[in-house]
């Protein structure tokens, strides 16, 4: 009987990570998740909910309710997994989450973000390490494309590690929804 070789020749599972406070989760998050799955043939997308975005004011809604609402928004889209990892990872840093999820090296990770986040991505903790360990999938948001294409991150990254998706389906942000 021939024994299978170790994992060297096995294809990695492609997953996406969409991180944020999801305060609140909305159909824009759902639509970019669906597009990312379709374009890249991702098996799953993790909505990695954080207690607090280090670049924004305190979240208005408590974590438990944000998780509950995010699960409601995804409905029957079972490829999306709503997760809170900070207690397991002991950090809210993106690089620590990526290292945690890929400790067994079995995933090809795509980190999903809006063009507005790309503008200041160079301020994220160990941003260059994030780009070395995963691909960035950036969705255009109205009014942000030109600025994001001039950003420190865009100009300093290997373009093979970054895909820019023109996306006009939904133009809403959690910040705008909170103002309503």
Swiss-Prot record:
Keyword field: ATP-binding, NAD, Nucleotide-binding, Nucleotidyltransferase, Pyridine nucleotide biosynthesis, Transferase
Top EC group: transferase
UniProt source species: Pelagibacter ubique (strain HTCC1062)
Family of the protein in this entry: Belongs to the NadD family.
GO biological process, one term: NAD biosynthetic process
CDD domains xrefs: NMNAT
Pathway it works in: Cofactor biosynthesis; NAD(+) biosynthesis; deamido-NAD(+) from nicotinate D-ribonucleotide: step 1/1
Protein name: Probable nicotinate-nucleotide adenylyltransferase
